[in-house]
Amino acid sequence: MSLVEELKTRNFSIYGQWIGVLCIILCIALGIANIFHASLVIIFSIICIVQGLVVVFVEIPFLLRICPVTERFSNFIRFFNQNWPRAAFYIGMATIQYCSLIFMTTSLLVPAVFLTITSMCYALAALKHQEFTGSSTLGGAGIARQIL
């Protein structure tokens, strides 16, 4: 199934996965950009970089197969193979980034907003009783089944 066909299915978990990929880029890039602040924002930028790296494994499942990770980390990532856990995971990460606003308003607000949008996509998929579906472009369909 091509990317366009996947997007036409109106499955919000696929939308969430693609916005999650955008979150990877935003978290890593803006985490690095904000690491040069001379305030407690540095802590949140480091957390944002780590969040981006964790989301890489959550959203691109075949990386668990090719990257050497511990069994504990692998089980942690596999826990998020349903819509509700992913929605909670993303809203939790967004909340952490929203807390950075306490110290200073920075561009870390952008990952927080996109993490919230991703969470809403997964929550909508769960509320509409849509089965969690990974994008085949990102290694979802056949490859994800072999891993799990």
UniProtKB/Swiss-Prot annotation:
Pfam families, sorted: Cg6151-P
Q: Which residues are glycosylated?
A: N11
Assigned protein family: Belongs to the TVP18 family.
Where does the source fall among the domains of life?
Eukaryota
| Name under which the protein is recorded | Golgi apparatus membrane protein TVP18
Q: Does the keyword Nucleus apply?
A: no
Q: How does the protein's chain sit in the membrane according to the entry?
A: Multi-pass membrane protein
Where in or outside the cell is it found?
Golgi apparatus membrane
Question: Could you tell me what this protein does?
Answer: Golgi membrane protein involved in vesicular trafficking.
**Which residue ranges traverse the bilayer?**
18-38, 40-60, 84-104, 107-127
- Gene Ontology CC, one term: Golgi membrane
- Which biological process, per GO, is one annotated for this protein? vesicle-mediated transport
Which keywords does this chain's UniProt record carry? Glycoprotein, Golgi apparatus, Membrane, Transmembrane, Transmembrane helix
Does ATP-binding appear among the keywords?
no
User: Which taxonomic lineage is given here?
Assistant: Eukaryota, Fungi, Dikarya, Ascomycota, Saccharomycotina
